[in-house]
Amino acid sequence: EELMASSHYGEHFARHWLDVARYADSAGFANDYARPNAWRYRDYVVRSFNNDKPYDRFVKEQVAGDEMDPDNPENLVATGFLRMGPWEQTGMSVFKETRQMWLDDVTDSVGQTFLAHAMQCAKCHDHKFDPVPTRDYYGMMAVFSTTQFAERKASFLPSESKLGFAGFRSLTQSKIAGYERQKKELAQKINRLKKAETGSAKVGDNGLDPGDEASQSRIFKNLIRHRIELDRIEPVTHSVFTGKTVSMKNVQGRLKMPQDPWGKGYLDPDVIYDGGSVYSQGDAVKPGGLSAAESLGGMEARSFPAGRGKRRLALAEWMVSEKNPLAARVMVNRIWSWHFGLGIAGN
């Protein structure tokens, strides 16, 4: 009781949950851009443990908080869970492939986090002794096919600390101003060299020092990184929304939510990808959960909404159903393991 009454209790067990949720302050890959608002999801998890939030609500907020109540900032912050995996879209990336990488990641992560079952073994084909067939894998993926990225406006909560915001803003803006000066000075130097070396020639050696070219690239990236960092103290959160998919070429910084989520774009096909290849469409599937859980728990097969329906909310409600044999026992096993070092079930 003494330990659970401590505010550090939530911090300690949030660390375990954040490991499961693949929490990261940056997006990974080559650019590894910062996620300046990720701290809000981290603090949400700490608060949830300290406030004894009911587990069913904890699950629903993270998987479908925006579909439950988009006007509740806490719900929007919670959906940061869906974006914690590594992701990058550069000018050299094929959006169709990076989109599929995220769909694979979120499908597998939801399966492992809430149902204790790795899903990606079923991505390419069925396995004789695996209770998750390929059709179930792509059925669960279809739940997320209308889920899109956005940094959404979410007012700061009274429980969120804003200490140090003013100092952070001042420091970051001074760094940006410094890089802007360097950028201007280097641009002037490059222009002088171009005129001196090439004159009015249209083709030829530009006369630039390779070091100057490298500096130009470095300054440009530093400007991007520090402008992104300023979002850390803005009332926005790393979140999602339900709508059509819009192709993106090069993502740097904040992704804004469209006024009409169902206006521009296209609907991802809800199909089995033969061999796991996004370029090889197979049979159509419907959004759904795991058939093995339904048969083991004696659950009635649930019909999930398609089209513009709230697919993620349907999945979250299916997972926390009292008849679902997996979700509750998975969390009990995690908590037991985190307290005593060994789970009730060793796997």
Language-model segment annotations:
Residues 1-167, 242, 247-252, 273-274, ...:
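Short, structured secondary-structure elements
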Residues 66, 74, 79-82, 151-343:
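Short, functional "switch" segments adjacent to catalytic/cofactor/reactive centers
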